[in-house]
Swiss-Prot record:
Upregulating conditions: In large ventral lateral neurons (lLNvs), undergoes daily rhythmic degradation which is inversely correlated with the activity of lLNvs, which is involved in the circadian clock. Degradation levels are increased in the early hours of the morning and mediated by the E3 ubiquitin ligase Fbxl4.
Protein name: Gamma-aminobutyric acid receptor subunit beta
Function of the protein: Gamma-aminobutyric acid (GABA) receptor voltage channel subunit. GABA, an inhibitory neurotransmitter, mediates neuronal inhibition by binding to the GABA receptor and opening an integral chloride channel. Together with glutamate receptor GluClalpha, plays an important role in the visual response by regulating the activity of ON/OFF-selective neurons. Plays a role in promoting sleep and sleep latency by regulating the activity of peptidergic PDF neurons.
Biased composition (Low complexity): 381-395
Extent of the signal sequence: 1-44
Taxonomic lineage from the root: Eukaryota, Metazoa, Ecdysozoa, Arthropoda, Hexapoda
UniProt region (Disordered), positions on chain: 376-451, 482-542
Cytoplasmic side: 357-568
CDD domains: LGIC_ECD_GABAR_RDL-like, LGIC_TM_anion
Keywords carried by this UniProt record: Cell membrane, Cell projection, Chloride, Chloride channel, Disulfide bond, Glycoprotein, Ion channel, Ion transport, Ligand-gated ion channel, Membrane, Postsynaptic cell membrane, Receptor, Signal, Synapse, Transmembrane, Transmembrane helix, Transport
Biased composition (Gly residues): 396-425, 499-536
Glycosylated residues in this chain: 58, 253
Activity regulation as described: Activated by agonist muscimol. Insensitive to zinc, glycine, glutamate, and baclofen, loreclezole, to antagonist bicuculline, glycine-receptor antagonist strychnine, and nonselective GABA and glycine antagonist RU 5135. Insensitive to flunitrazepam, pentobarbitone or pregnane steroids such as 5alpha-pregnan-3alpha-ol-20-one. Inhibited by insecticides picrotoxin (PTX), cyclodiene dieldrin, TBPS and lindane. Inhibited by ivermectin, fipronil and pyrafluprole.
Extracellular face of the membrane: 45-268
Length: 606
């Protein structure tokens, strides 16, 4: 009741005549005064802006009015045009980028913008936008946005939930939240470690198709920002780009946004830990080319150590990378270094093998020289006996002179000397047969040629101990010495002297024969004709026996080169090949890996 009502009531009431009536009036007046005081207090609070009042605007009343007939389960404009949701991002940091897991982790602000007409209110001075806490999210509809390639994510809640809502008087809503997301990033490591990776974050509605929600970049090309303080140990952020697309799935067509960030790998770590050490290992393997080829322990130990070191380096490098099937650029470099180190080891194996073969040839040649010297001395004795005939001499026909088994060849061996006289084959064969078959003591006297018998006319065979001197145009000494070691190597001393198997001089008299064929005294039988096969008789004799001086020069070579030549060539060929490979490798891979994505906004040009 107001004061005027109280005055009116007092005038109308008659004056009390008893104390009880006075007490009743006092109580009523006290109750009326208390009610009036409460009303005045509420009026003062409203005038001073207390509670949820801003001037004459009640903020709480505005927020409470949003819940009247509002259903957060239904999107705005349901049944009408789709809701357009604008998106912006600002990347604060990128903490990791893993080649093994094929993912990257980034921390960013994620903002969404949309309009809900049900949240519009009348514009008042000073109240154009309402900033409310994250609890208000539970009372309104929000887009069901999710990250398609997300592996793991979490919200930041220190010290409170890092999220806010702004409601504009027109019904436009802004939602901002801080997120940390680990997203998958398929990588192509073909040019590793000179590669450039393009990682992306894809944004899409989980349940609403394009008939209900369409996403767009809210600020056009400037919707994505990256802090200039972003840094990674092995990568540099080159730039970013943004795309909008439509994805068709079995449940319908969906609107999707993609933010792509390109990274460039820093090569400092790999240069220090892999490239330079592997190059030095290759260079160390070349030290063996300057060591003496007889220093087998040093050269073998150096070669094996470098090969094992390269194997360990390759294994440790690939252990930190995913098991992929294609070849990476670092595999090309390490593989080439391994091949060159292994080739250095094989080079010494080749040098050792050639030195062993040459040493075996020297030993065989020295054995041949020793045996030839002994037989030459025996032939000198035979020539002396020809000049001074003895009763044991068996003189044949015009074809030659024969010395029996007891001749100058010593026990068990015989010497048959045939001296051609320039007669034809028939004449030589006829006299030879007559002398040999009848043993006529009065055979026609023949003139024995005094042509010296040289070392070049010696032919040795393995397995027979016999010697013969054959004419007519040249004299040949044949003897056989059993040499199982030489025979096991695919050759004989006879081959060494004659220059190989199957030559025209390889058909000597059989074992134990003291004379030649029936037509010739001691194997002469040919008159003055050339040896079998025709041509120059000295052509059948090996050149290294006709020219002993040249033998000493060529015997130290195999296939025209010496072991020392291989070391000399390797000192030049290996470094040149490695330098050429490095030039080609770095030029090609640095060029082909320098790829920048189209429409890329470089960092610092935002």
């Amino acid at each position: 009741m107001s004061d005027s009502k109280m005055d009116k009531l007092a005038r109308m009431a008659p004056l009390p005549r008893t104390p009880l009536l006075t007490i009743w009036l006092a109580i009523n007046m006290a109750l009326i005064a208390q009610e009036t005081g409460h009303k005045r207090i509420h009026t003062v609070q409203a005038a001073t802006g207390g509670g949820s009042m801003l001037g004459d605007v009640n903020i709480s009343a505005i927020l409470d009015s949003f819940s009247v007939s509002y259903d957060k389960r239904v999107r705005p404009n349901y049944g009408g045009p789709p809701v357009e949701v604008g998106v912006t991002m600002y990347v604060l940091s990128i903490s990791s980028l893993s080649e093994v897991k094929m993912d990257f982790t980034l921390d960013f602000y994620f903002r969404q913008f949309w309009t809900d007409p049900r949240l519009a209110y009348r514009k008042r001075p000073g109240v154009e936008t309402l900033s409310v806490g994250s609890e208000f999210i539970k009372n309104i509809w929000v887009p069901d946005t999710f990250f398609v390639n997300e592996k793991q994510s979490y919200f930041h809640i220190a010290t409170t939930s890092n999220e806010f809502i702004r409601v504009h008087h027109s019904g436009s809503i802004t939602r901002s939240i801080r997120l940390t997301i680990t997203a998958s990033c398929p990588m192509n490591l073909q040019y590793f470690p000179m590669d450039r990776q393009l990682c992306h974050i894809e944004i899409e509605s989980f349940g609403y198709t394009m008939r209900d929600i369409r996403y767009k970049w809210n600020e056009g090309p400037n919707s994505v920002g990256v802090s200039s303080e972003v840094s990674l140990p092995q990568f540099k952020v080159l730039g970013h780009r943004q795309r909008a697309m439509e994805i068709s799935l079995t449940t319908g067509n969906y609107s999707r946004l993609a933010c792509e960030i390109q990274f460039v790998r820093s090569m400092g770590y790999y240069l220090i830990q892999i490239y330079i050490p592997s190059g030095l290992i290759v260079i160390i393997s070349w030290v063996s080319f300057w060591l003496n080829r007889n220093a087998t322990p040093a050269r073998v130990a150096l070669g094996v150590t470098t090969v094992l070191t390269m194997t360990t380096l390759m294994s440790s490098t690939n252990a930190a990378l995913p098991k992929i099937s294609y070849v990476k650029s670092i595999d090309v470099y390490l593989g080439t270094c391994f091949v060159m180190v292994f080739a250095s080891l094989l080079e010494y194996a080749t040098v050792g093998y050639m030195a062993k073969r040459i040493q075996m040839r020297k030993q065989r040649f020295m054995a041949i020289q020793k045996i030839a010297e002994q037989k030459k001395q025996q032939l000198d004795g035979a020539n002396q006996q020809q000049a001074n005939p003895n009763p044991n001499a068996n003189v044949g026909g015009p074809g030659g002179v024969g010395v029996g088994p007891g001749g100058p060849g010593g026990p068990g061996g015989g010497v048959n000397v045939g001296v051609g006289m320039g007669m034809g084959p028939e004449h030589g064969h006829g006299h030879g047969h007559h002398a040999h078959s009848h043993g006529h003591p009065h055979a026609p006297k023949q003139t024995v040629s005094n042509r010296p018998i040289g070392f070049s006319n010696i032919q040795q065979n393995v397995g027979t101990r016999g010697c013969s001197i054959v004419g007519p145009l040249f004299q040949e000494v044949r003897f056989k010495v059993h040499d199982p070691k030489a025979h096991s190597k695919g050759g004989t001393l006879e081959n060494t002297v004659n220059g190989g198997r199957g030559g025209p001089q390889s058909h000597g008299p059989g074992p134990g024969q003291g004379g030649g064929p029936p037509g010739g005294g001691g194997g002469g039988g040919g008159g003055g004709g050339p040896p079998e096969g025709g041509g120059d008789p000295e052509a059948a004799v090996p050149a290294h026996l006709l020219h002993p001086g040249k033998v000493k020069k060529d015997i130290n070579k195999l296939l025209g080169i010496t072991p020392s030549d291989i070391d000399k060539y390797s000192r030049i060929v290996f470094p040149v090949c490695f330098v050429c490979f490095n030039l080609m490798y770095w030029i090609i891979y640095l060029h082909v890996s320098d790829v920048v994505a189209d429409d890329l906004v470089l960092l610092g040009e935002e």
